[in-house]
Amino acid sequence: MNCHRSHQSPRRRTLCFSLNTALIAVLAMGALTSSAETPRVSDGHGAYATGKYRNLFMEQGHAASEVKAKIDAAYQQLFHGDPQTQAVYFESGKNANGPLAYLTDWANHDARTEGMSYGMMISVQLNHKPEFDALWNWAKTYMYISDPHHPSYGYFSWSCKTDGTPNEETAAPDGEEYFVMALYFAHARWGSGKGIYNYKAEADRLLTTMRHRAVMSGSTRFGPRTVGNEVDEKYKMIRFVPGVDRGDFTDPSYHLPAFYELWARWGPVEDRQFWAEAAEVSRGFFVKSTNPVTGLAPNYANFDGTPKPTRSPQSAIFSYDSWRTASNWSVDWSWWGKAPQERVLSDRIQAFFAAQGLDKFGDQYTLEGKEVAGRHSTGLVATNAAASLAATNPRARDFVETLWKTPVPSGEQRYYDGMLYMMSMMHLSGEFRIWAPK
């Protein structure tokens, strides 16, 4: 079954499903360990170990007050700006758990787990608890599949209409990944409450489901589905979807080793070794899945890193999902400093886009570097700038300064562009941090 992530906007992505089972783990040193033990993993040399986060804007001469004002203004515009031209966050009444709000893809008139989880992450990082809780309440109320007989039980419908009606009843793992991480950070920053606001319990439950959900078949509003877990145990990678019929490949932009390292420390104990190994696998996968000259990754890839063609024309090229991949490896370098190849990858992709022209590069390319679509998208401007966290070449400063001068996205495409703009600004200013439990 095929379902498109976008219809009217230029951003499209095919979704459906997958499965597998859990195995025993081996420590990197070669010694066998019980799955109930916390793995002995290095803390690396990044912000997790040092507690220090670079502010690249200040490094380039912008005052701390300027940086804070710029980020605060972006949050205000995207969350509380003009509802027709600026905002993507909308309040939606109350229920027994309190206020409700959704974050919408304005061009497609829906709410997605991707955007809802991004909104929660941005809110916990910037200490906006009311918005965080309202988004989580809406996600649990309308997106969460609580029927134990439903094939997607325990997951979230990846897309709903803004009235809460599902557009599909299957999951997109990038949403679950960001939900889990945002909930752990909320627990660390604000403390857990009761019910759906017991952030740690909710994160633990969802992370367990992602790895261990048994295969289930059944009916949905959109036809029969067979759904399993969201990871491939053999390859130790996140799947594109948890459906059995479409679960044999991955999406490079779903790979979040910076998060997996934290789950290897804070997640359910029996799964910590798996996430420690998954982090290392993803670091190697970034190299395998990117072109050795351009640094471009495909939207979808096989587990060996080769591009994965599907009926979606963007599957095997650098397209909308792919924008995020460089940001993922660069944040991993910033937080952990364990994989020097990530620095090479950042230099490589920035060299490619610099050659295209910082003020005019397109937003879709073949992996070899032939332009497919010429729209100059703020979201890609943002993630290319975030690559500067790992870059070594002086050109990285030009990418940072270009983002600094770029206005907050508005208009029809403000959802995806806006979320990537907001998070990249936070990464580059040192305001996207690890909130560790006390």
Predicted regions and their residues:
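Bacterial N-terminal signal peptides
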Residues: 18-30
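C-terminal functional modules
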Residues: 362-438
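Aromatic-rich carbohydrate-recognition surfaces in CAZymes
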Residues: 109-119, 164-191
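Lumenal/extracellular "mature" regions of secretory-pathway glycan-modifying transferases
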Residues: 82-86, 90-92, 130-175, 185
